[in-house]
């Protein structure tokens, strides 16, 4: 019997397996798919020689995450000249750059980033700390810099940047929470960029798998479970809460995030954007509240993704059809359709992208099991994006669940030693 069984070999499950193996535990990872990685996979999805990411594609949270630094995982990030562009048909373009002077957030933005640096450590600690984290949360709420950041009043282009970044989530972008998400992703983009991974996002998974196997972790693929496995110390469920509910027979109260339509393309050349900044930004935002499209173009940042002079790209939307997405791109880049060599369309059902809504009803202590990884089942921990700190490739949920399992085992061991000592006296 293994010390721990991790159900699910997405990045959170692999992070958890690595953390436990580092402490000398024997670990088995069981994955229903025929390959590990979950959302963090890539391949020649459309035609040979062109690499597209299966789901996640750009990684500001990964670049910022203390988890990957703690594990010593060196990810080969690649950046474009700019971070992102959000063009409008009126001829203006909002720009996010790692150079604050190029970012169109207005003249106060450098000062804003100075204030951001004062609160960023507390935010990053939140990625690896379970809630309720009352003291840290109160300290952050009372931090003057945090309050001033939320009162930021950018100009029109800056507001467009915040809006587009907020729309990476399913939160109303002009709400307080939406504004906070928009500011967070804008600031992380300023600090860390929106890098892609050289050769494809699957490289992250390969690095985590190699590290785990070097520490004796057993990885079994293509095994779908109908009941919880047994382990000496802990079972970590790196799966969504609805799959956990299916296995355990318990109901889940978490609300799903919206369905998503994702398109991938192989192209005969770079996208002919009418916006000059969009020609230099791997991430492009199109539209607004009701018709938002998130678009990615890889090869300007990572030439290994396609043959010379060619391009691979992707887009997703929560509200538009495939034809509407392509029509929207064509308006901003006339001639785009003529460059398309091949396309792949995937409809992702509700809950598939972030494993739960990012709205208030599923934040912090309102997340499943009051924001902590314990599930109410003995020694079973939730280690997926359904748990705090939620979606994004940062490894926080896997890290938190693994630390909880280690602490619980240590307490049980201490109680056992205490009982043994008492019985001998």
Where are the language model's segments positioned?
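Mid-domain catalytic core of redox enzymes
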Residues: 88, 221-307, 422-424
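A glycine-rich dinucleotide-binding beta-alpha-beta segment and adjacent secondary-structure elements
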Residues: 158-172, 334-388
């Amino acid at each position: 019997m293994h010390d721990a069984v991790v159900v699910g070999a997405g990045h959170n499950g692999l992070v958890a397996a690595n953390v436990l193996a580092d402490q000398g535990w024997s670990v088995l990872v069981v994955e229903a798919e025929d390959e590990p990685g979950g959302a963090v996979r890539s391949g020649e999805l459309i035609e040979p020689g062109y690499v597209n990411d299966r789901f996640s594609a750009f990684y500001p949270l990964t670049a910022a995450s203390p988890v990957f630094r703690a594990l010593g995982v060196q990810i080969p990030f690649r950046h474009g000249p700019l971070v992102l562009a959000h063009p409008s048909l009126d001829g203006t373009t909002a720009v996010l750059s790692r150079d604050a002077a190029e970012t169109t957030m207005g003249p106060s933005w450098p000062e804003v980033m100075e204030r951001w640096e004062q609160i960023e450590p507390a935010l990053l600690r939140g990625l690896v700390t379970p809630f309720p984290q009352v003291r840290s949360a109160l300290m952050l709420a009372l931090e003057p810099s945090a309050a001033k950041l939320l009162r930021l009043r950018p100009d029109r282009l800056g507001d467009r940047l915040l809006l587009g970044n907020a729309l990476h989530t399913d939160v109303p972008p002009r709400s307080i929470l939406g504004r906070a998400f928009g500011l967070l992703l804008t600031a992380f983009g300023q600090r860390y960029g929106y890098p892609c991974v050289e050769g494809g996002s699957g490289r992250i998974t390969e690095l985590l798998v190699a590290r785990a196997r070097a520490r004796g972790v057993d990885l079994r693929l293509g095994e779908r479970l109908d009941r919880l496995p047994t382990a000496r110390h802990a079972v970590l469920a790196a799966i969504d809460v609805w799959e956990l509910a299916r296995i355990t027979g318990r109901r889940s109260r978490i609300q799903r995030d919206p369905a998503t339509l994702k398109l991938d393309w192989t192209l005969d050349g770079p996208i002919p954007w009418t916006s000059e900044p969009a020609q230099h930004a791997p991430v492009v935002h199109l539209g607004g509240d009701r018709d938002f499209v998130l678009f990615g173009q890889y090869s300007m940042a990572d030439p290994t993704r396609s043959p010379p002079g060619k391009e691979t790209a992707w887009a997703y939307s929560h509200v538009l059809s495939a034809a509407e997405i392509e029509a929207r791109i064509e308006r901003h880049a006339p001639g785009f359709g003529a460059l398309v060599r091949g396309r792949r369309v995937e409809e992702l059902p509700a809950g598939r992208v972030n494993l739960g809504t990012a709205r208030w009803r599923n934040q912090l202590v309102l997340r499943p099991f009051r924001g902590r990884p314990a599930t109410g089942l003995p020694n079973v921990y939730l280690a997926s994006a359904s748990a705090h700190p939620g979606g994004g490739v940062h490894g926080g949920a896997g890290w938190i669940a693994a630390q909880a399992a280690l602490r619980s085992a240590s307490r049980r061991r201490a109680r056992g030693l205490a009982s043994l000592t008492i019985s001998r006296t």
